[in-house]
Structure formats: structure tokens, C-alpha cells
UniProtKB/Swiss-Prot annotation:
This is DNA-directed RNA polymerase subunit beta. The RNAP catalytic core consists of 2 alpha, 1 beta, 1 beta' and 1 omega subunit. When a sigma factor is associated with the core the holoenzyme is formed, which can initiate transcription. It is an enzyme of class 2 (transferase). GO terms for cellular component: DNA-directed RNA polymerase complex. InterPro entries: DNA-dir_RNA_pol_bsu_ext_1_sf (IPR042107), DNA-dir_RNA_pol_bsu_external_1 (IPR019462), DNA-dir_RNA_pol_su2 (IPR015712), DNA-dir_RNAP_su2_dom (IPR007120), DNA-dir_RNAP_su2_hyb_sf (IPR037033), RNA_pol_bsu_bac (IPR010243), RNA_pol_bsu_CS (IPR007121), RNA_pol_bsu_protrusion (IPR007644). NCBIfam families: PRK00405.1, rpoB. Pfam families: RNA_pol_Rpb2_1, RNA_pol_Rpb2_2, RNA_pol_Rpb2_3, RNA_pol_Rpb2_45, RNA_pol_Rpb2_6, RNA_pol_Rpb2_7. Its EC number is 2.7.7.6. Keywords: DNA-directed RNA polymerase, Nucleotidyltransferase, Transcription, Transferase. CDD domains: RNA_pol_B_RPB2 (cd00653).
């Protein structure tokens, strides 16, 4: 049924959907570089982490520890063993390091190598990723979520006018490295420029610039144009050069020939005027002396005679100063040009408030500000300053950061330079000043642009953890080097792996980004692996994140899904990767586009990041195109720079790959998504992830074509690794004999797939696989051979297709409630299996050992009937709450016995009172069947009968695998050898010495009958007369066979050894037992159900089939929904799905009616072709036999599957045509009759098939009741919540309600005996037992708590009770 879906999509698929968990697997592969030879490994990932810390030298430089290579060993337990035993799936990591010891020549100060010691060291275990992109940590499956954070680089921003009341913009810049100190540049209200290092106190930026070695003069010359003024006698002249541009003319400019005025005094000079002035051969222009006061000097002015400084640079000239200049006969002045409106004064003014004279002073000032407690010395201050931004060890801008900086500041620096340079900081300050002055080329950055946000995937996150651990280890190594004698030391004496292992295991166990995998169904697994989070270490926090960060941004198109995100406080902070998106090596998200050249769309595809996409003009995927690839139409709606524009075809240079590249996997599964309101689509995508896998899954009649892809990539189904023929198949395994082309010498050519049976998932849903191939069937590589949970025939099947009517029915669909037919419960359509795990441990306590046993004191035989001899519940037993699962006794503390008791005890050996019953019992609300029990025993402890039985069962399974594998390869070789030997003459006699039987005489003709009698171990002795080549071939085949059998035997023995070995248990635990109970949950009132369009509701009533509204032909509908749930919610997609679903169901029935009424042969085929209308399908029908066609049609009895891809789905006319084909009313409505009265309803009612899901919010998990139970110690009130077996809180509002009704006695009872009146509780219990009807409420305990609290505040409060 799922093999062919009628597809309504009009756009052909250009690019296959990439593997959906690629983001996880690729990232971890690049991190490990496991398959790369050590010498060829690139400097990132694990290799990069080691290289960044090694070599480690001691403080005196006498020795150095160098890193050579690492290798990853073999895994000890496979994935399933780790899950069962609660282990971490990890492999040993070994590193090769060498210790180099130097001798220093005292005279020449030269270092000579004295000694080199190289050694391989065990470096802890490194967790490995499973094929499904998850990690197994302590037996639970976890996912490392990728983090979306701000990319390193430089960012310019302003405060949007919020700081100052005047609304003036205050600009700032920030340089963010991957590792190291942040550098902030910011203006204040007076336009002074300040710098902050690591968000500490701000200081004038010039302190930092001076610390880098720039003098005041250098700074003025760098940031300003300098004018040269000559002084001759009483007059001053300005040099004619570039610095005059933008200034007013100091004097009239006349033509040298005619003397007429070309430019009047006061005219503003631009480049054209400057050129004309130079043409007049004017070299200087006379200035008015009044122009000079207030001009700022660009250099110091020295006395020509004494050399003393008359005026410092950055000083303003005064009228008196001009007189001094004339007096001293100074010939030339340099002044700075502050711009026409004197706006560019930031650096000049900042220099005025900065008191630093020399770079040394500036460095010490910075050290003082960042390290206030340490007294500075010039040396330490200099070292500290260099380490802030200029050294690789402490500062790393990363290649991404350097590239972004080059792009923004228009620099041309190699991306290998990952530290800051002085020039970078100067360029940043210059850009910030230009930005403030409104230079057109400068712009602020949008931090929500995906060019400024990058993804840290698993590999990078774990690499960072290794770095942190290695840096801690480095300190310890340096100390050890200085303390111990280097001559005798070996590398392993220095390296202690504990700090590294601790950091890595802490990350996997408790980091915010390492999450317990959402395993409700295959879709929730895939979505969890594709999730991007802005939270986590180094990211945002929920409280601080504003609206902008959460909002959808134009650059999200095709990269991040605009629909799928959680509702609530995390909205927009946790998002999902779009279907075709991928993360590139720098961590930026790319999306694919088809290239357009000269107006023609090419099949070539290119992936672009958000920055690369900025200047492209991109047409949508559904833009009509002619056969030659040129666009239809004169104007095309396209995207350019985040906006929608209409352009001519020649301007377009890219086209979207597919209409669904915009949304994520979960949203792609919603048919008619384009007709749903985005809020409802969001709920729809989120609720599909909560759908419980059903006992009998069914694929959706109306799908989108993505169902098969999701099922395949999720890892829930079993995919054939190689092509071959199914040799045998049963409920728990599939054996495939591979085709010869795929075999290698050591390979047996047999693939055995063990299916997962009834395993508990992280969310207590049932993970079960069942084979969908038959014995003798041929399978191709990549075919799906077994279905998993929530999959049907290799497609995702989260729910069921049910017949729905949109109408009101007796108020049972008020507020989105759902009315359901009893047929659905009867036929187990929405029945699901849930598996709960209960465990208990027998520990070694101070008072003695606990024991797991059937012999429990004071428990009757009735309660023990389900336990076996070992005290563990039997398989297949039905249990309910309170039943014993595992019998366990714990020693009690010794009580002081009287001498009589001691005597009695000595005589009768009475020991039972020394132990108490601590058995594992079924908790309240659980009722089901025991499906499995696992027993783990400590080393040295004896295995009980149950453990032995479990072990024998597992070994028998392995034995069966071994026998099958050996049988298949032996038969294959026997067949090949038989064909070679048949009809040949035997060259020697074949005798079985044990049985003394002659099988072949020399010279006999070899026949298949004779060969079949000869035992396998004698085949190698068969020789052929006069045919050496055949003999050699046979010998080679037999040798290969024995090799392969040896491999199989070795594998089997290794597995058996593992099974027999004792288990690693936590300290102090002797034995651990896990019991698994399967609970069958039928649909019942209170369960939550939903469609795929955000149409959710709670089941209000299960109605007998005969009362449901029914069609004219007597068929009742399955579900009744409220029609008012559609218009206000604007999810019209569900109505279109209803119509199309009805048509699909109707066509399936029509075809089967044709089959039943013997309309076979061509008529049936033509009908099929008319429905599917696809070339591929026609080929299939024409090639199929009559019987195959009938079988195919029979499968369609439930309806024909159709796919309506997102944004390219079925149109209204398509749906009408389908309804007509199925002979159904084209309105999609029908007259229904009331099941209670048989009367028709007034109007026609919209009916059809909807795919409905049962969600994980089941009423059985939520309903809870308590009479007596645990109480809080302080307040003596009942605890709260189902988990604590708590009571219902009676809050203020409830008290008011009781008061309003005057229910005084009930209220008094609520607040005293039913809550915290301890004495009253006991009294009322006694009264109930005796059958009396008295109630004496006393003083609530909370009153005493209040009194004590007041007394603790030194208020003397006491209650005086009257007698």
C-alpha cells in the first residue's frame, strides 16, 4: 500500500533529502578522525585539542612533554549490552607522548637534547556515537543538542536611542573571540571613546592604544588629516594639499594670466576645486591670523634654540601662542583637521582626559584595572598585557572570527592569524568613529542575521570539553615536572587522566545540552537530533533573551524552520533545522539552490550561507519553467536581500530546490500546511512528536511523501546492509544470504539481523520491530526489511485513519472535546503498549547483607504465588498494584532481648524477627503483564536459578545464530565444490577412521550422491586424478570455509564469555533485579487526541456504535468533532484533508467492488492508471501479472494512499476530481442519520477520513487518588503530587467557596482532621474502625509552626488553653 502513493506534487525532485541525522554523525566523525592515519590528521577536533595544549614544558625549560598521536581502541560492549547493563558505550583512548629532556650549555646558553622517552598511555574512555546519532550514558540514550551562538568576530551596534533622553544614538563595537577576553569599544554621551576588557570598568580607549606603543602624535596623525601651515614674518600660509578638502578657502584665488577671481574667499574646497587651484600653480594660500587660534597642534612645537617643548601636541593654539611662534621664528606648524562642523573630536577629546605619558604607564594602568589586588611590576604587566589579545595560548579568534573581521574592516590578513594585531584594533576604532560620523560605507550589524550566528555541533562541544580538561591536566603536569626528578621519570608518571575524564563525563551526564532522548516515536527522535538551542553554557538565558532573538528572521529561509518551536518560555530559543539545510565546516547553516545561468535553470545545485545569499536574486521553486529551463512569464516574484521583489527573468540567478526546503521535518509531514495558520501548524508539528506508537499502526491515507524518508533515517526500521536472499525469517530475527559480489575473503556472506522485541523506550513507550519480508524474497541494499514502532510497511505511521463527521452531538464536543465510537476501542485501533521498568538492589548494609528470596516473614502463600524459587516474579504473570515483584529481606538492627527470649531463640532457632520485608511491589495505578526480568550478579556472588536460566536462554539464541551462519556458508561452499568435482575421477581413497567407513575409492567417479554422504571434515582430503587446477581450487575453497567457520566460532565464544561473566555493579550492591511490565492502554475518556493541524481535544465519551451518526448505507462514523473548532483557529488544512481522505477511501472501496464483481483484466488496470496517472506506476501495472494486480488492489481496501507535498499539494479542483472518480458528492458533505432516533440531521454534514493521533498525555498516567499516605515532617500536611502519593491541596479559593456555601463542618474537617491535626487524625481513624460517627477536630499542626516562626523572630507568642 505504501509502495505507491498518488502524488499531487507538480515540481520534480531535483535533490534527494539529505540524511536527516547527518548533523550529528558527520560532526562526530570529523571530531574523532578515527579512519584517518595519525600523520594525516587535520588540526581540529580531538587532534586540535591535543595540539593546542601540547607540548608542555616545565617552568625552567629543562624538559618538554610532546604529543605524538592518539588511537581509539575496540569497544568492550556493544550498544544493546550497554543499554541492558547500564554501561556507557565508549572505547578506550590511548595517546603516544614523548618526554624530551634538555641539557643547557652554560657558556652558549644553547639547548641540547639529552634524552627522549616515548610511551603509549591509556587516556580514559571516550564515548562513541551509535549509528542512530545518540550516546549511551549509564545505560540511557542521550542526545547532544547543537548550540546556536554568536559567531566570533567584530560587531557594531547602537543603543537605538534608549540611553539618553535626547534620543541620540550611542554606538559601540565588540570583538568576540572563541576563547579569550572580550573587547568592547563604546562612546559616552560626550562622544568620548572608552574601552572595556572583559566587561570590566571602562577606561579611555587611548590608554589601550598607547599601551600598544602608539604615541599621542601617532594617534592624531592616524585618525585625522594634518594641515601644514608655514609662517613667514607676520603672515601665515596654508600648504595646498589633500588636507584642504572640505575646508573653506582662506583667500581669493585668481587666474595667473588674467587676474580675474576664480574662487572667492570662503568657498568650500572639493577635489575639483583643489585640482583647479593646483593648475594655477598655487602652492600655498595666505591665511587670516584670526583663523589660527583654537586650531589643534598635531606635533610638539620645540624652541629652535634650546630644544625645549613650547607647545605639546593636541594643544589648542591661543592668540598668545601665535605671538610666541612669530617671536621664536618657527617656520612650520602642523595642525589637525577636525572636519567642517568640528564633529570629529572623539579621539582628540579622549586624549585630553587620558593622563598616560608612555606605553609602560598605560600597560601598568590596564593591569591595575583588571588585577586590582596584585601590585604590578613592569615585567608582569607587560606579560599580562600581551596575553590578553596577542598570544595564541590565551586568545583565539578562530578562522571564522578572522574571516568575519577581514570582511567587516576590509582587511587582507591570512585566516591563520587567529590573534588580534595592533592594526586590527586601530581599524576597529577608526570604523566605529566613521560609523558615528555617518560615513555611508559603514553600517551596524544585525546580530540575529544567520551570518552572525553559528552552530556548535556535538564534535565542537566535546572538543571544548577536552580542551578544558587538558588545560587542567597541563597545570598538574608542570607542577610534577618541577617537583620530581626528571632523569628517572617516564611519561606515564606525569600524565594523570582524571581531570580530563571528569570534565568529559560531567558534560555527558549533566550539561544543559546533553539531553535525555525524546523517544516517544521515531519522529520525536529525529527532531531531537536536529534541534538547535540558543540556551546552554555560553549561550542566552530564557530571562535575558528579548523578542528580536526569538523572532523569525529573513535569513532563516531554508535554514531554520519558521514553524517548529516550543510554546512557552523557550519559544524561538529552541528551533529546528530545515529539511535540506546542512551545517558547513565553519558552523554556518547552508541551504541548497539551483543555479540559473543566462536565464536558464540548471540541474546543478549549490549550497549557500546567509552571507553568500545576500546579493543573490532567488526565485521560488514553484516558478513555472519551460522545457529548456527558461522561465515562463515576464515578471517573476523573487527574494533579494530579505525582501520580496518583482524582477525580470534575466536578473534571477538562483532558484529554490524544493517548496518544502523552508520548513523542518515535522512540519513537512503536515499535508495542506499552506492552508493552516502558523500557530496551529506549530502545535501540529509539536503534537506529532507526542504521538504514542500504536499496537496496530496504519500509514496516513493523505501523506506528504516524507513518511518513508523519516522512517528510514530515524533508525526505527531495519535496513538491509547488503543485497541478497532471505534465508530464514521469524519474529525475532532475519537471516539474509548475501549476493556473491558483496563478499570478501574473511566475510561469511551472511547477515543476521536480530530484531528488537518489546523494549522499553526512554518515555516508557514500546519499541518493537517486526519483519516485513518473506523467506526466499530477494532484497536490495537499502530496502526496509523490518518495521519498527509507529511504522507501517516502511513508512511513518503515528496514528490511524478514521471516519470523522464535523457536527455537534449532545454537547459532548463542547470546547474541542471528541466523541468516539465504541468500535475504535473494540477493535484496538488506538490501543498502545507501554512498558515500565522497576528495579531493586540487594545491598551489603552495616547490619548485614540484604537477600533476594521467596522466604519473606509474615507474608502469606497467596502473595508469593507468582514468585519462582529465586524470589523473582515469573514471566507472563498478570500483576496489579501492591503485588510483589521481587521478594527481598533486609536485616533489622539488633534489639535488646530478655534472657527468656534469648533462651527460646536458642532452642527454636527463631531468627525471622531479625529481618524486615523490603520487597519490590507494584506501585499504585499500574496493572499489566510481566514480560521480562533481568538479574545482575556481583563478581564472586553465586548465580541463582533465575540468572542461570536467563543466561542459558541467551546462549541458546547465540548458538542458533552460529549454527545458521555455519550451515549457510557450508551449503554455499558445498554447492560450489560439488559443481567443480562432479563427474571427476577420485585421486585417493576417502575413509572415516572412526566409523571405519569407505566413502570413495581411488578412481571412482564423483557424484552428488557420494558427496552428500562425506562428512565435512573429510572434504579437504578429496583429490582429483589428473586435474591439479580443480584440486587447487577445491583446496582453496575449503581453506576459506574453515577460516570463516573459525571467525564465526571466535565471535560466538567471545559473546558467550561476556554472557557468563559477572556484572559490574555499583559499590555495595550484591545483586540487582530489573522487572519489566507491559501495560496495555486502551483508548478511554480523558485521553488526549489530535490531528496533524493543531486540532487537539480530550476524549469526552465513548458512544456505542449503534448511537453514532450513520450514513445512508448504515455505516456509522468513528469520531465526531466540533465544527466550531475550525473557523476561529484558521486551520482549514484539516477540512481539505477530510475531503481528500474520503476520496482516497472511496477509490479503494470502488476498486475492490470492481474486483468483487469480477470486472478484472484490462478494465481494472485502466481504472488504476486513471487514478495514479504516473509513468512509473503504469510501468509497474503493465509488468505485473493478473494475480499481482489483484493482490495490489486488495491491499487498497483501506483506501489508496496519496501524497500532497507541503506548498505543492493538491488543489481544490484535484480534490473535486478525486471525489468524482470515487462516485462521492463533490461538496464533500453527506446526509447523516441520528443513531438514536434514525432521523436524518437537518443539514448535510462534512464527513471524511482524518489521520488522528493518540498523544502521550494519557488519563491513566494522570489520574490519582489518596486516602492516607505520606505527610510532610514540619507542617504534618499531606505531600503533593502523584509521584509522592500526595493529596489534593485545598487552597484559598476553595476555602472561600466553602465559606460562601456555609459548609462550616465540612470546611473544619478539611482544615483539621483531613490535613494536619495529628491527634484528630488518629481519633477519627479509631471512630471509623469502631463504626462511630463522632468527629472532634483539634489544633492544626500548622498553627504550632506559625507560633514557632514568630518565636524565632523574638516575638513571645503562646497559646493559653482554657481548662
Amino acid at each position: 500500500m505504501g509502495e505507491f502513493r498518488k502524488n499531487f506534487g507538480r515540481i520534480e525532485e531535483i535533490l534527494e533529502v539529505p540524511n536527516l541525522i547527518d548533523i550529528q554523525t558527520r560532526s562526530y566523525e570529523t571530531f574523532l578522525q578515527e579512519d584517518v592515519a595519525p600523520e594525516n590528521r587535520k588540526n581540529f577536533g580531538l587532534q586540535g585539542a591535543f595540539k593546542s595544549v601540547f607540548p608542555i614544558s616545565d617552568f625552567s625549560g629543562k624538559c618538554s612533554l610532546e604529543f605524538v598521536s592518539y588511537k581509539i581502541g575496540a569497544v568492550r560492549y556493544d550498544v544493546n549490552e550497554c543499554i541492558q547493563k547500564g554501561m556507557t558505550y565508549a572505547a578506550p583512548l590511548k595517546i603516544v607522548v614523548r618526554l624530551v629532556v634538555f641539557d643547557t650549555d652554560r657558556l652558549s646558553d644553547q639547548k641540547n637534547i639529552r634524552d627522549i622517552k616515548e610511551q603509549e598511555i591509556y587516556f580514559g574512555e571516550i564515548p562513541l556515537m551509535t549509528e542512530k546519532g545518540t550516546f549511551i550514558v549509564n545505560g540511557t540514550e542521550r542526545v547532544i543538542v547543537s548550540q546556536l551562538h554568536r559567531s566570533p568576530g567584530i560587531f557594531f551596534d547602537h543603543d537605538k536611542g534608549k540611553t539618553l533622553t535626547s534620543g541620540k544614538l550611542i554606538y559601540s563595537a565588540r570583538i568576540i573571540p572563541i576563547r579569550g577576553s572580550w573587547l568592547d569599544l563604546e562612546f559616552d554621551s560626550k562622544d568620548l571613546l572608552y574601552v572595556r576588557i572583559d566587561r570590566r570598568r571602562k577606561m579611555p580607549v587611548t590608554i589601550l592604544l598607547k599601551a600598544m606603543g602608539y604615541s599621542t602624535e601617532d594617534l592624531l596623525n592616524y585618525f585625522y588629516d594634518v594641515e601644514h601651515i608655514f609662517c613667514e614674518g607676520e603672515n601665515f600660509y596654508a600648504a595646498v594639499d589633500e588636507s584642504l578638502v572640505g575646508h573653506k578657502l582662506y583667500d581669493d584665488i585668481r587666474d595667473i594670466n588674467t587676474g580675474e577671481i576664480l574662487f572667492k574667499k570662503g568657498r568650500r574646497i572639493n577635489k575639483v576645486i583643489l585640482k583647479r587651484i593646483r593648475e594655477q600653480r598655487v602652492e600655498r594660500i595666505k591665511m587670516d591670523v584670526e583663523e589660527l587660534p583654537g586650531r589643534i597642534l598635531a606635533t610638539d612645537i620645540l624652541d629652535p634654540e634650546t630644544g625645549e617643548v613650547l607647545f605639546h601636541c593636541n594643544e589648542a593654539l591661543s592668540a598668545a601662542g601665535i605671538d610666541v611662534v612669530r617671536e621664536k621664528g618657527i617656520r612650520e606648524l602642523s595642525v589637525i583637521n577636525l572636519g567642517e562642523d568640528l564633529s570629529n573630536v572623539s579621539i582628540r577629546d579622549t586624549l585630553l582626559i587620558d593622563r598616560m605619558e608612555t606605553p609602560g604607564d598605560a600597560i601598568i594602568e590596564i593591569y591595575r584595572r583588571l588585577r586590582p589586588s596584585n601590585p604590578p611590576t613592569p615585567d608582569t604587566a607587560q606579560k599580562f598585557f600581551n596575553s590578553l589579545f596577542f598570544e595564541n595560548e590565551s586568545y583565539d579568534l578562530s578562522t571564522v572570527g578572522r574571516a568575519k573581521m577581514n570582511y567587516k574592516l576590509r582587511l587582507d590578513v591570512s585566516t591563520d592569524v587567529t590573534v588580534l594585531r595592533k592594526e586590527d584594533i586601530m581599524a576597529a576604532v577608526k570604523y566605529l568613529i566613521d560609523l558615528k560620523n555617518g560615513v555611508p560605507e559603514c553600517s551596524v550589524d544585525d546580530i540575529d542575521h544567520l551570518g552572525n550566528r553559528r552552530v556548535r555541533s556535538v564534535g565542537e562541544l566535546i572538543e571544548n570539553q577536552y580542551r578544558i580538561g587538558l588545560v587542567r591536566m597541563e597545570r598538574a603536569i608542570k607542577e610534577k615536572m618541577s617537583l620530581q626528578d626528571i632523569e628517572t621519570m617516564m611519561p606515564h608518571d606525569l600524565v594523570n587522566v582524571k581531570p580530563v575524564s571528569a570534565v568529559v563525563s560531567e558534560f555527558f551526564g549533566s550539561s544543559q545540552l546533553s539531553q535525555f532522548m525524546d523517544q516517544t516515536n521515531p519522529l520525536s527522535e529525529i527532531t531531537h537530533k536536529r534541534r538547535l538551542s540558543a540556551l546552554g553554557p555560553g549561550g542566552l538565558t530564557r530571562e535575558r533573551a528579548g523578542f528580536e532573538v526569538r523572532d523569525v528572521h529573513p535569513t532563516h529561509y531554508g535554514r531554520i524552520c519558521p514553524v517548529e518551536t516550543p510554546e512557552g518560555p523557550n519559544i524561538g530559543l529552541i528551533v529546528s533545522l530545515s529539511t535540506y539545510a546542512r551545517v558547513n565546516e565553519f558552523g554556518f547553516i547552508e541551504t541548497p539552490y539551483r543555479i540559473v545561468k543566462e536565464g536558464r535553470v540548471l540541474p546543478e545545485v549549490k549550497f549557500l550561507t546567509a552571507i553568500e545569499e545576500e546579493n543573490q536574486v532567488i526565485a521560488p521553486a514553484d516558478q513555472p519553467v519551460n522545457h529548456d529551463g527558461s522561465f515562463k512569464g515576464d515578471l517573476i516574484s523573487a527574494r533579494k536581500g530579505g525582501d520580496f521583489v518583482n524582477v525580470v527573468p534575466s536578473e534571477v540567478n538562483m532558484v529554490d530546490v524544493s517548496p518544502n526546503q523552508l520548513v523542518s521535518v515535522a512540519a513537512t509531514l503536515i499535508p495542506f500546511l499552506e492552508h493552516d495558520d502558523a500557530n496551529r501548524a506549530l502545535m501540529g508539528s509539536n503534537m506529532q512528536r507526542q504521538a504514542v506508537p500504536l499496537m496496530r499502526p496504519e500509514i496516513p491515507l493523505v501523506g506528504t511523501g516524507m513518511e518513508r524518508i523519516v522512517a528510514r533515517d530515524s533508525g526505527a526500521v531495519v535496513v538491509a546492509k547488503r543485497s541478497g536472499i532471505v534465508e530464514s525469517v521469524d519474529a525475532s530475527r532475519i537471516v539474509i544470504k548475501c549476493e556473491s559480489a558483496e563478499k570478501t575473503d574473511r566475510d561469511t556472506g551472511v547477515d543476521i539481523y536480530t530484531l528488537i522485541k518489546y523494549q522499553r523506550s526512554n518515555q516508557d513507550t514500546c519499541f518493537n520491530q517486526k519483519a516485513i519480508v518473506n523467506k526466499g524474497q530477494r532484497v536490495r541494499k537499502g530496502d526496509i526489511i523490518a518495521d519498527g514502532p509507529a511504522t507501517d510497511n516502511g513508512e511513518l505511521a503515528l496514528g490511524h485513519n478514521v471516519m470523522v463527521a464535523f457536527m455537534s452531538w449532545g454537547g459532548y464536543n463542547y470546547e474541542d472535546s471528541i466523541l468516539v465510537s465504541e468500535r475504535i476501542v473494540k477493535e484496538d485501533i488506538y490501543t498502545s503498549i507501554h512498558i515500565e521498568e522497576f528495579e531493586t538492589m540487594a545491598r551489603d548494609t552495616k547490619l548485614g547483607k540484604e537477600d533476594i528470596t521467596r522466604d519473606i516473614p509474615n507474608v502469606g502463600e497467596e502473595a508469593l504465588r507468582n514468585l519462582d524459587d529465586s524470589g523473582i516474579v515469573r514471566m507472563g504473570v498478570s500483576v496489579k498494584s501492591g503485588d510483589i515483584l521481587v521478594g527481598k529481606i533486609t536485616p533489622k538492627g539488633e534489639t535488646q532481648l530478655s534472657s527468656e527470649e534469648k533462651l527460646l531463640r536458642a532452642i527454636f532457632g527463631e531468627k525471622a524477627s531479625d529481618v524486615r520485608d523490603t520487597s519490590l511491589r507494584v506501585p499504585p495505578g499500574v496493572e499489566g503483564t510481566v514480560i521480562d526480568a533481568k538479574v545482575f550478579t556481583r563478581k564472586g556472588a553465586e548465580k541463582d536459578h533465575r540468572s542461570q536460566y536467563i543466561e542459558d536462554e541467551a546462549i541458546a539464541m547465540l548458538q542458533k545464530d552460529r549454527e545458521d551462519e555455519i550451515r549457510i556458508i557450508t551449503e554455499a561452499v558445498k554447492k560450489e565444490v560439488g559443481t567443480l568435482l562432479q563427474g571427476k575421477q577420485s585421486g585417493a581413497k576417502i575413509v572415516d577412521p572412526k566409523r571405519k567407513k569407505i566413502y570413495l575409492k581411488k578412481g571412482d567417479i564423483i557424484t552428488p550422491e557420494i558427496l552428500s554422504e562425506i562428512p565435512l571434515h573429510l572434504w579437504k582430503e578429496i583429490t582429483v586424478a589428473d586435474d591439479e587446477e580443480t584440486e587447487r581450487a577445491v583446496g582453496q575453497m575449503m581453506a576459506n570455509l574453515y577460516d570463516k567457520i573459525e571467525v564465526v566460532e571466535a565471535y560466538f565464544n567471545e559473546k558467550t564469555e561476556k554472557l557468563k561473566a559477572s556484572d559490574e555493579l555499583p559499590p555495595g550492591v550484591i545483586k540487582m533485579v530489573k522487572v519489566y511490565i507491559a501495560i496495555k492502554r486502551k483508548l478511554q475518556a480523558g485521553d488526549k487526541m489530535a490531528g496533524r493541524h493543531g486540532n487537539k481535544g480530550v476524549l469526552s465519551r465513548i458512544l456505542p456504535e449503534e448511537d453514532m451518526p450513520y450514513f445512508k448505507d448504515g455505516r456509522p462514523v468513528d469520531i465526531v468533532l466540533n465544527p466550531l473548532g475550525v473557523p476561529s483557529r484558521m486551520n482549514v488544512g484539516q477540512i481539505l484533508e477530510t475531503h481528500l481522505g474520503w476520496a482516497a477511501k472511496g477509490l479503494g472501496e470502488k476498486l475492490n467492488d470492481m474486483l468483487d464483481s469480477y470486472q478484472k483484466g484490462n478494465q481494472l488496470r485502466d481504472e488504476l492508471k486513471g487514478i495514479y496517472q504516473s509513468r512509473e506506476f503504469e510501468k509497474f501495472v503493465d509488468g505485473a501479472t493478473e494475480e499481482e494486480t489483484y493482490q495490489f488492489v486488495r491491499k487498497l481496501r483501506r483506501g489508496i494512499a496519496v501524497s500532497s507535498p507541503v506548498f505543492d499539494g493538491a488543489t481544490e479542483s484535484d480534490i473535486r476530481n478525486m471525489l468524482k472518480l470515487a462516485n462521492l458528492p463533490s461538496t464533500g458533505q453527506a446526509i447523516l442519520y441520528d443513531g438514536r432516533t434514525g432521523e436524518p440531521f437537518d443539514q448535510e454534514i462534512t464527513v471524511g477520513m482524518i489521520y488522528m493521533l493518540k498523544l502521550h498525555h494519557l488519563v491513566d498516567n494522570k489520574i490519582h487518588a489518596r486516602s492516607i499516605g505520606p505527610y510532610s515532617l514540619v507542617t504534618q500536611q499531606p505531600l503533593g503530587g502523584k509521584a509522592q502519593f500526595g493529596g489534593q491541596r485545598l487552597g484559598e479559593m476553595e476555602v472561600w467557596a466553602m465559606e460562601a456555601y456555609g459548609a462550616a463542618y465540612s470546611l473544619q474537617e478539611f482544615l483539621t482532621v483531613k490535613s494536619d491535626d495529628v491527634a484528630g487524625r488518629t481519633r477519627i481513624y479509631e471512630a471509623i474502625v469502631k463504626g462511630e460517627n463522632t468527629s472532634e477536630p483539634g489544633l492544626p499542626e500548622s498553627f504550632n509552626v506559625l507560633v514557632k516562626e514568630l518565636q524565632s523572630l523574638c516575638l513571645d507568642v503562646e497559646l493559653i488553653e482554657e481548662e
